[in-house]
């Protein structure tokens, strides 16, 4: 089995540091988890928030805590630390070799995309960011591990690209066009999405 992970990132215009943090952690019972958090607003304060959330989550995952429980614990910690005044989005994408599934954990209004052959599914059921209350629960989707399965995970910067000009980025259409034209590597797919967003 081969797992490929690709990341593409650019700083927000006129901001020295983004609020995004991404880490990969090995799961003690086999597999890997990719943890992506985005702190509210931008700059050092947002970065500190996303780093705190990611540290909490990867620490718990490394101890064998389930993804949903790790997300809830991170939300409670953020709510307690910031008194409910700061939010943070969170996505966890896990390859769980114990259950033989892909586990998608979302506390993020921004959708995830699942690509399998010619089929592209958008996971856009409304999800609440971390830190808004003490009882925040993530949305969890489990998929069987399959060859050529692609999970597209992103922060809201991609979603909001082009909105001010009235031409918001259409992630689904970009994915469809890229996947139809070629058999792109994960890095090519990530770079293409980012390039289209920057162009807008």
Walk through the language-model features, giving the residues of each:
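Active-site-proximal, acidic helix/loop segment immediately C-terminal to a metal-coordinating Asp/Glu
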Residues: 42-63, 149-200
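Short, function-defining helix-loop hinge/capping sites that tune catalysis or transport
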Residues: 28, 46, 97, 117, ...
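Catalytic core of PPM/PP2C metal-dependent serine/threonine phosphatase domains
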Residues: 47-117, 124, 187-200
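Regulatory cytosolic signal-relay segments
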Residues: 1-18
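Acidic loop->beta-strand submotif enriched in PP2C/PPM serine/threonine phosphatases
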Residues: 15-32, 90, 123-169
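Hydrophobic residues at beta-strand termini and immediately following loops
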Residues: 8, 122-123
